[in-house]
Amino acid sequence: MFGRVPRSNNTKYYEVLGVPKTASKDELKKAYRKAAIKNHPDKGGDPEKFKELSQAYEVLTDPEKRDIYDQYGEDALKDGMGGGSDFHNPFDIFEQFFGGGAFGGSSSRVRRQRRGEDVAHTLKVSLEDVYNGSMKKLSLSRNILCPKCKGKGTKSEAPATCYGCHGVGMRNIMRQIGLGMIQHMQTVCPECRGSGEIISDRDKCTNCRASKVIQEKKVLEVHIEKGMQHGQKIVFQGEADEAPDTVTGDIVFILQVKVHPRFKRKYDDLFIERTISLTEALCGFQFILTHLDSRQLLIKANPGEIIKPGQHKAINDEGMPHHGRPFMKGRLFVEFNVEFPESGVLSRDQCRALEMILPPKPGHQLSDMDLDQCEETTMHDVNIEEEMRRKQYQRKQEAYDEDEEEDAPRVQCAQQ
């Protein structure tokens, strides 16, 4: 990053610590020690004042940063350090200075931890599983903190802080390349490769070889509750991969309900299709339906209860259980398809007999005069889907032929 840095306030940090601009490193330490204890939030101090003290101490005890601050002020440091985002945590500086028990016990501050990633798995289940409820055991591999070193990666109590980056993992390279010109680059610390820690070969944990984690196989019992939906999530909190200084993420199972050969589900209702004959549609029927829990349901219509093609009948409380209220269920809908007899099955006598039984034909009878004025037609059986495909192909072929005619060379008349 290049830019001309204007001069700004270069006395604020000295005033915050209450020292002159000529203060030595020992004087800075003494001033910080006194002010930090007084203003620590655990002692009722102002958190913003405590933060300012830490920033001032961090800048003025770093010779390179102090030189830039003395020449160009606070704004130059902010521009050169990515908007000031590279300051260390003020509590970290305090604990490095005093240790963890400055007030006779461990600090009440909990170090902010990043959250680990969740791990999602698709779990295929049957419609029977979500109707009856079921349990599945799944074996998974995951990383856990090494039990021998407790995730430190070392034999000793804790790894050493990297001297190259002071535990940050990144190094800021700042150079003055001209009058009022500063070059700033941020790179991964080559000493610790971004970890902020240094572990010697002799101090590496023999169990995890300083990786801090080991692999574990774990069996999870996944309970599919009655009435769960396609796409619903089952969450195992804190069961994903563990890592140091990280809040462990969750393992998430996403239900994928497989298509059933007979039943279809819509919310808490179930649908089935049933094909019946014309005789059954007119004179009644009965059949046995095996439900998702293997119960046998008797489905019937009494003689004279006419079933029309495409008609639906509902059976209460035989649909899906409500999730969370499994004793309440939706409805089971039966859609009826009526299969008519083939042409030629009925004789003329049978047709006349049916006419006597069935309701009369609607409308009036055509007279001989009406018939004489009409042209007689003949109807043929047709597969309408096949007919539409044939028509579509024919239209495409005609359009292709027209394009070829337009692209053909035209014959020019000879000039006289």
From Swiss-Prot:
Zn(2+) 1 binds at residues 146, 149, 205, 208. It is found in: Nucleus; Cytoplasm. CXXCXGXG motif repeats lie at residues 146-153, 162-169, 189-196. Residues 380-399 have a biased composition (Basic and acidic residues). Residues 12-73 form the J domain. CDD domains: DnaJ, DnaJ_C, DnaJ_zf. Interacts with ZFP1. Belongs to the DnaJ family. This is Chaperone protein dnaJ A6. It comes from Oryza sativa subsp. japonica.
